[in-house]
């Protein structure tokens, strides 16, 4: 059985007996984050089903935006676009950027990604097309805590983010679940 077949089979069993606390939710209200909070965090697999209980959040409480290294790469990158929807359409009033110790992005470089892409058959022309952006993204990430400071600063100074939105920065330990306050938004 392939992975996608396994996922679909699991989903069929799940849907045959869904949790009752999910099926009775109001469709409109369930899209709005109850805590009026958006979280920008990493896509690391160790955070799945671990970060949420460590924060005391559950389904319907917050909007969670994940990417490699919880990076903000531009004034209108996909993370900022998601935050704009969170703020202007869904009522978010606070943002927390959560980095984590032992983040793989600290060891990722544009060179390592370029070599891997070329070895998997991506053309040199395609890599050259994105090389500037790739360098700026992958080579800028040096240390997870510095990246949290950087991401918070980019959100706070973004001309599209209202000044009344509080932006905080936390570090999370993927083995202990411990949170550390890095930046307290005012």
Language-model features: locations:
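Short beta-strand segments
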Residues: 40-42, 66, 98-100, 170-173
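Gly/Ser/Thr-rich loops at beta-strand to alpha-helix junctions
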Residues: 44-46, 101-105
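Divalent-metal-activated hydrolytic enzyme cores
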Residues: 1-35, 70-79, 87-92, 105-186
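Well-ordered alpha/beta subsegment
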Residues: 93-97
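Short Gly/aromatic-enriched secondary-structure transition segments
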Residues: 52-57
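A short, structured active-site edge motif that brings together acidic residues
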Residues: 63-71
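N-terminal low-complexity or amphipathic/hydrophobic leaders
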Residues: 30-46
């Amino acid at each position: 059985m392939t992975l996608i077949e396994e996922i679909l089979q699991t989903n069929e069993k799940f849907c045959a007996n869904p949790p009752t606390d999910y099926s009775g939710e109001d469709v409109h209200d369930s899209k709005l984050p109850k805590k009026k909070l958006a979280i920008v965090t990493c896509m690391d697999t160790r955070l799945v089903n671990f970060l949420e209980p460590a924060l005391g959040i559950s389904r319907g409480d917050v909007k969670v935006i994940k990417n490699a290294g919880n990076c903000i790469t531009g004034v209108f990158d996909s993370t900022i676009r998601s935050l704009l929807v969170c703020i202007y359409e869904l009522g978010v009033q606070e943002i927390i950027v959560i980095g984590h110790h032992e983040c793989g992005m600290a060891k990722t470089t544009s060179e390592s990604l370029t070599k891997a892409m070329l070895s998997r058959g991506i053309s040199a022309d395609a890599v050259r097309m994105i090389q500037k952006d790739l360098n700026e993204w992958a080579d800028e990430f040096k240390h997870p805590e510095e990246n949290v400071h950087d991401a918070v600063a980019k959100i706070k100074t973004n001309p599209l983010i209202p000044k009344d939105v509080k932006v905080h920065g936390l570090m999370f330990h993927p083995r202990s679940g411990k949170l550390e306050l890095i930046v307290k938004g005012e």
